[in-house]
Swiss-Prot record:
UniProt keywords, alphabetically: Cytoplasm, Nucleus
Family: Belongs to the hid-1 family.
Keyword set includes Cell membrane: no
PANTHER family per UniProt: PROTEIN HID1
Pfam families: Hid1
Protein name as annotated: Hid-1 family protein P27G11.12
Length: 797
């Protein structure tokens, strides 16, 4: 405010709100509230949450009165004022009314009795026969119109010098001419969008599953020109943000913070409107909607689904690329580059929703190299999010997009081309991967992600394994590294202790087996290294297929009281040899029945990495036992949460480097410092009690037979050729020309059901709210609209 006296007068007006009862509408206190403040910070600092809570508790009628007065004032100002001077008192008055309402609405929504009053106040049609719309509809129309008010948020247009003119703020989708840009218009748009976000926040304070009446109304406005202009304005403003120099093209650096606020609120309001599917609001709103005898629709998502010019798709892809990729290439200090790291979720949610509503955009995306850029970036970002428990939903969003891309046949086939370093990844940190295809890279990265997440985020691990199932249907020319990663994933997923630690882990094993079967059945002549590698380890697969529930439970029940061989009672995981004896005994039995000797993999002949031959008959007792311990240690080591993002280099680089080191090292993991694993937190269902009935429901459905039929026959031929001294090239030629058993139906996990799509839509909406609330918080230098209020929607998220 301009002076200490003004601040004191405003503060006294706030105190009167909870000290006096029934302040009339014509009292001068209301005028002081909208004339004295100068900035949003003044309103939020001098009208605290504690003050408003006292008003709600001691004089709720004053809170109701101020809402009514502010609504009327904003409507009157729009009708009667020209707004030809940004410094005019009327402009300041309108802005302060918006700031006050932004501050007040969360207090109204968090209280049940106040929400009931607001529902009646906003959505009950007045008894006046000349009025057929409720106050809420009129007010929301007014607020939206402020976004297109001449000389307030847009410049004069031709002969139009005042009033509302629906137009698109920024060049881009649908609109190409450039509009005059002024800083005052940007700041005013921020205030209007912030008010809309506050009005939409009703649903984050509810626990009944119903949405926001205000958001549902705005999304269902049947004015095509308004919807087109607002949707295009929000998209274009967000997509035109030039991050290359960390400032907008038309603003000096000092004003970039204000423009970044506009980007944040454009994204937030856009995502909330796009994802609006819950048309159930408060009782009075529902009555109002039913009285109109029309089914409510989300015209924003409908219009988005009809967007089809390739030029518009190109604009959106260019904008997403600017927002996602350049910050990772930036040479400026990491602390500054993290500014855009906060925006990644907003861009990815938008991408997910756009793909969800517009199939044309998705097909356009996969027809270009941008899809591979996005795919590699998502893998990279997944490792970055892996180390922080607070970014679980960020990781889940990346995995959802990965799964959607790999579910497309044409995209999976494109991954068979040779891998090239991506410009989307940091210049200073190239991926330590060469000599393979994008499919090889993807299998290695996803296998690592599954081993990192399977003990902590089973849902994410399952989705990643589903992606492997789709990819392996079309993957060709897989090299030794990816073949080995796939086998290690099978080892990790088939560990007996892991299978019985809860009631869903077996799904991960089922998906991994499905991925292997898809790879060996549908690209046999192209995947000779994969077939050779698994054939040489077919005894291990047969040993796993011979596991019995009784043997596993006997080990578990023989452990200390209250403990499991896979975890301890205090939730800490340790490496354990308890279950190794089961696999070892099964392997001995399989080897004793095997008609052919075992020949170790010769890395020099077949180009495989120098993997320790841990299953040789000569070292069956010592070697296999050692390998099981090594595999157990590796599993738990990989499951450890990695260090926070700022303390180390990119996690994808780190993970691939470690994986390559392990594959090329003769030493057992237990001979390294990494082998001395400390206890780590572990998500185990301690209430789960495995039963024979539970085991028999899923164990028979695991398709070991397809693998064993192929690998058993192939291993016999490989053994005969090795005994005859045939070179590696002839063995590989035999594998490529071999006639294999008839293929079964491919294993394709079903996920694109109506229920799954609804779950994804709900997740995207909740996540959009979570990110919006986080960006608005004080720690992100936001005004803190929702801080100090009782937000309920994230309790179970």
């Amino acid at each position: 405010m301009g002076s200490q006296q003004s601040k004191l007068d405003f503060r006294n007006a706030v105190l009167r709100l909870h000290e006096e009862r029934n302040i009339p509408k014509f009292d001068l206190i209301w005028e002081r509230l909208w004339t004295l403040p100068e900035t949003t910070e003044d309103v939020f600092h001098l009208m605290s949450i504690d003050d408003l809570t006292k008003v709600k508790d001691n004089a709720p009628e004053n809170l109701q009165t101020i809402i009514a007065v502010l609504w009327d004032k904003l409507e009157d100002l729009q009708k009667e004022t020209l707004f030809d001077d940004p410094a005019a008192p009327t402009t300041k008055c309108a802005l302060n009314c918006m700031r006050l309402l932004t501050r007040l609405m969360p207090i109204i929504f968090e209280d049940k009795s106040m929400l009931e009053w607001f529902d009646y106040f906003a959505w009950t049609v007045p008894k006046d026969p000349n009025i057929n719309t409720p106050r809420g509809a009129s007010f929301l129309n007014t607020v939206v119109d402020y976004l297109f008010l001449i000389n307030f948020t847009i410049p004069a247009h031709n002969d139009l010098t005042h009033g509302v003119h629906y137009c698109i703020w920024e060049t881009g989708v649908v609109y190409h001419p450039t509009m005059l840009k002024e800083r005052s218009y940007e700041l005013h748009r921020v205030e209007v969008l912030r008010l809309l976000l506050s009005l939409f926040s009703e649903e984050i304070y509810r626990t009944d599953g119903n949405g926001s009446s205000c958001c549902a109304y705005v999304a269902s406005i049947a004015n095509r020109r308004l919807v087109l202009c607002l949707l295009s304005s929000l998209i274009n403003t967000a997509m035109r943000f030039n991050t290359m120099f960390w400032k907008p093209e038309f603003l000096p650096l000092d004003n970039s913070v204000a423009h970044m606020s506009l980007i944040e609120y454009c994204f937030s309001v856009l995502l909330i409107l796009m994802s609006e599917e819950n048309n159930n609001g408060t009782p009075c709103y529902n009555n109002y909607r039913s009285s109109k005898n029309t089914l409510p629709k989300n015209y924003f998502s409908i219009l988005l689904s009809k967007l089809q010019p390739y030029s518009d798709f190109q604009i959106i892809l260019d904008g997403m690329s600017r927002l996602l990729y350049p910050p990772m290439q930036s040479t400026i200090p990491k602390r500054s580059s993290l500014i855009m790291f906060d925006y990644y979720p907003l861009v990815l949610i938008f991408c997910k929703l756009f793909i969800h509503y517009n199939e044309r955009f998705f097909h356009y995306l996969i027809d270009t190299d941008r899809a591979i850029d996005l795919f590699i970036f998502l893998l990279y970002l997944s490792f970055e999010y892996l180390g922080d428990p607070s970014t679980y939903n960020h990781l889940k969003l990346c995995v959802i997009l990965l799964k959607r891309l790999t579910a497309e046949k044409y995209f999976c086939k494109r991954l068979n081309k040779p891998f090239q370093q991506q410009t989307a990844l940091p210049i200073s940190m190239p991926v330590p991967f060469e000599g393979g295809t994008y499919a090889d890279f993807t299998i290695i990265a996803i296998s690592l992600l599954v081993q990192y997440t399977k003990d902590y985020h089973s849902e994410i691990a399952q989705m990643l394994c589903c992606s492997l199932c789709y990819l392996c249907l079309y993957a060709q020319n897989l090299n030794s590294h990816s073949s080995q990663s796939l086998f290690e994933l099978f080892q990790s997923a088939s560990y007996p202790g892991f299978l019985i630690s809860n009631d869903v882990n077996h799904k991960i094993l089922k998906y991994v087996i499905g991925a292997i079967n898809n790879a060996i059945q549908y690209a046999q002549k192209y995947n000779a290294p994969l077939l050779y590698f698994f054939s040489m380890h077919k005894d291990y697969i047969e040993a796993v297929s011979a596991l019995s529930f009784d043997a596993i439970m006997s080990v578990r029940n023989s452990s200390a009281e209250g403990d499991s061989a896979y975890w301890t009672r205090n939730g800490k995981t340790f490496s354990s040899k308890a279950f190794d004896s089961i696999l070892l005994s099964r392997l001995r039995y399989v080897r004793s029945k095997s008609p052919t000797p075992y020949y170790p993999i010769e890395s020099s002949e077949f180009g495989f990495t120098n993997l320790k031959d841990v299953t040789s008959k000569d070292e069956i007792t010592d070697g296999f036992d050692k390998a099981l311990r090594s595999n157990s240690l590796r599993t738990h080591r990989d499951s450890r949460p990695v260090q926070p993002l700022l303390k180390q280099r990119p996690q994808l680089h780190r993970a691939l480097t470690e994986s390559a080191t392990l594959h090329g090292n003769d030493r057992s993991l237990e001979d390294t410092d990494e082998a001395k694993v400390e206890p780590i937190a572990h998500s185990v269902d301690y209430t789960f009690k495995p039963t024979v009935e539970w085991w028999n429901k899923w164990w028979p459905s695991l398709n070991f037979r397809t693998m064993l039929d192929i690998f058993t026959d192939l291993s016999l031929k490989i053994s005969d050729m090795k005994k005859a001294g045939h070179p590696a090239s002839e063995i590989m030629a035999m594998i490529k020309t071999q006639k294999y058993p008839a293929t079964n139906q491919p294993y394709i996990p079903k996920y694109r059901t109506k229920e799954w799509r609804q779950q994804l839509a709900n997740f995207a909406r909740l996540f959009a709210w979570q990110v919006s609330c986080d960006l608005d918080s004080h720690k992100r230098e936001g005004p803190g609209i929702f801080e100090g209020t009782d937000v309920k929607i994230f309790d179970s998220f």
